[in-house]
């Protein structure tokens, strides 16, 4: 497992509060107990207080120190309803409509972040990705400079000696077929996320073609996206379009992309679509012995992240650290 040492040290100096909507789930409770023991992230558990405490006690998890909030008995609920109606007034939101929506912990938790009562949110242990992302889009919304929410995976291959190998892949989980401008956004957001893991970026825009070796609309898309990204981020080494072997193998790079500032040693990989991205990170995870952390949602005004419903407590703990570190 990736050590998260630098992130934890920074969080100890400046602890963050993370909202956990599925507060009674045993995996969430185990992760929360570990976070509390480390004293660098303050969890807010959402749900029925008696149910949460009973679940923790039965499982032997110490959650003393965690804040527990029940949407059914929240003293600022009227204020939350008012703010939510204001946010959604263009959609015809009324208090009558808002109340049952905000009783759902995914919406309630996202509003806590919006109101400044939590720094970030991690959900999805039982909620679907759509049920985690939808409230984020409606309430937190994208940064002014962004038009989309995207995602990346951070992949870590532990080294027997020396430093771990850390790479990033995007977009593997949100945008099905991003256009040129969206790929540029995905690139910038992924570089920023990878920097939190100490990655010195070398970005490859991937394709089945290298430097015009094949002709296709998808190749043209990656060529144009590369040029736009180079113009927008001139300080970052970016190249494309590159096949994966040219991006990672110095020997192949000499043959296929001589003189490239990236080919042969890329560490951030921008895929043409979600098919390639999703397959790519899973191949790296299952056959390349990389640990995969994500999907990490990018482009929002505050960190909101989504777990796999098949996650374990260690994955919840790891994603909580990543989410808080981005706050």
Task: List the predicted regions and their residue ranges.
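Anion-binding alpha/beta catalytic cores of soluble intermediary-metabolism enzymes, centered on
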Residues: 1-263, 268-327
């Amino acid at each position: 497992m990736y050590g998260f040492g630098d992130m934890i040290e920074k969080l100890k100096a400046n602890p963050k509060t993370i909202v956990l909507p599925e507060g009674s789930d045993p995996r969430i409770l185990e992760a929360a107990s570990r976070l509390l023991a480390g004293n660098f992230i303050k969890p807010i558990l959402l749900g029925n207080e008696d149910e949460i405490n009973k679940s923790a006690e039965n499982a032997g998890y110490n959650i003393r120190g965690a804040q527990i909030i029940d949407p059914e008995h929240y003293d600022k609920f009227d204020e939350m309803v008012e703010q939510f109606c204001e946010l959604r007034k263009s959609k015809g939101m009324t208090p009558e409509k808002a109340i049952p929506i905000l009783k759902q912990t995914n919406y309630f938790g996202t509003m806590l972040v919006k109101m400044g009562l939590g720094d970030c949110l991690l959900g999805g242990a039982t909620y679907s990705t759509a049920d985690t992302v939808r409230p984020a889009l409606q309430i937190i919304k994208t940064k002014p400079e962004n038009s989309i929410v995207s995602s990346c995976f951070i992949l870590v291959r532990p080294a027997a000696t020396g430093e771990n190998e850390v790479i990033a892949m995007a977009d593997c989980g949100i945008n099905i077929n991003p256009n040129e401008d969206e790929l540029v956004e995905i690139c910038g957001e992924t570089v920023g996320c990878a920097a939190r893991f100490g990655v010195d970026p070398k970005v490859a825009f991937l394709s089945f073609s290298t430097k015009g070796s094949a002709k296709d609309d998808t190749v043209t898309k990656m060529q144009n996206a590369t040029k736009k990204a180079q113009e927008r981020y001139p300080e970052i080494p970016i190249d494309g379009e590159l096949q994966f072997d040219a991006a990672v193998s110095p020997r192949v790079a000499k043959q296929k992309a001589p003189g490239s500032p990236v080919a042969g040693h890329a560490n951030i990989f921008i895929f043409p679509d979600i098919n390639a991205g999703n397959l790519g990170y899973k191949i790296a995870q299952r056959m390349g012995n990389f640990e995969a952390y994500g999907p990490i949602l990018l482009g929002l005004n505050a960190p909101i992240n989504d777990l796999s419903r098949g996650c374990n407590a260690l994955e919840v703990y790891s994603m909580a650290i990543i989410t808080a570190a981005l706050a």
